[in-house]
Amino acid sequence: MKKRTYLSAGLALLIGTLSVHASPGLSDVKSRVLPAVYKSKNGLTQKVEISVKHEGEPSTVTIRLGEQSRKEKLVSGDNVFRIEIPEVSTTRQLPLTLTSGKEKEETMVTVKPVRHWQMNMVQHTHTDIGYTRSQMEILAEHLRYIDYALDYCDATDNYPDFAKFRWTCEIAWAVSEYLKCRPAEQIARLKQRVKEGRIELATMYLNFDELPDEQTLAASLYPIKQFRENGMRAEVAMQDDVNGIGWCFSEYFADAGVKYVNMGTHGHRALICFDKPTVFWWESPSGKKVLTYRAEHYNQGNFFGIHTDDFEQFEERVLAYLDQMEAKNYPYDILACLLYTSDAADEEDS
């Protein structure tokens, strides 16, 4: 009997300590407790990933983990299976047995409680005047994106609530222009979706760097009044692709009724501060406060591959990210994941 210990690069992978009987058929058995709670017909569950190398001809294997048991097909080479177990509230040691013909592998798997993560996917169209094209050239496209968002809301009205399409208008410029030029029917559709919470209006006119002065930044918030005169709620500011935000906004936002700030950082030519998302009360010199979330990159969802239609890859990357958050002692169980298209994308793909 040979005892092996497998370590993961992420501290929260919870790899089990394995006692493996050497055999020509089954070998290199590993276990991994996934860092998430799943909803299923059996209630809340956790999943244990079992990987095993099979050196013989294709056959079947019986996997027993605790009280759960099932048969799977074995192929020559590497095999990966996921076993669903009831959610645990305390750390438990579960026996794992793999049986294929006369071959048998046994070990213990440590299953620890995991967080009830909530990851909010924030879909938006990133606005990058100058990097893409001039504002006169791209305005028509940004107005069209709002039309598309309204159509997608209509198309998913009969979906379960968690699956209904939702959209965030990253900056106020395009929405302000939309209210000036679109037909009354379209404006009414937008108002209704904002009222329902299906479309969120952000309040910053653009993603500003350090060049504008305080008077310019104060004047840039005029669309907030325009939105509210049209009966549309606007309580969040988004600052994407520019690391940091003008200090004067801490005063302006509070006075204008903006309650939240979300910052999607940029790490290509600038340093991303801190090693994980942060939440804090941004306090102005006069003592006014706005709740601020410093998120990851403003297209983090694209890094996860959500736009590729490869859900298995997307899930694996999200799980790896949750492992990282555990390892970095992220203190909350809610995360925001920003995702977008249009920034340098082909028009037909936007």
Task: Name each model feature, range by range.
Residues M1-K2, D346:
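Generic N-terminal leader/processing signal
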Residues P24-D343, S350:
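Catalytic-domain carbohydrate-binding cleft regions of carbohydrate-active enzymes
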Residues S19-H21:
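Sec/Tat signal peptide C-region and signal peptidase I cleavage site
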Residues L14, D346-E347:
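Short stretches within intrinsically disordered, low-complexity N-terminal or propeptide regions
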Residues A9-T17:
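Bacterial N-terminal signal peptides
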Residues K2-A9:
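Bacterial N-terminal signal peptides that target proteins for export
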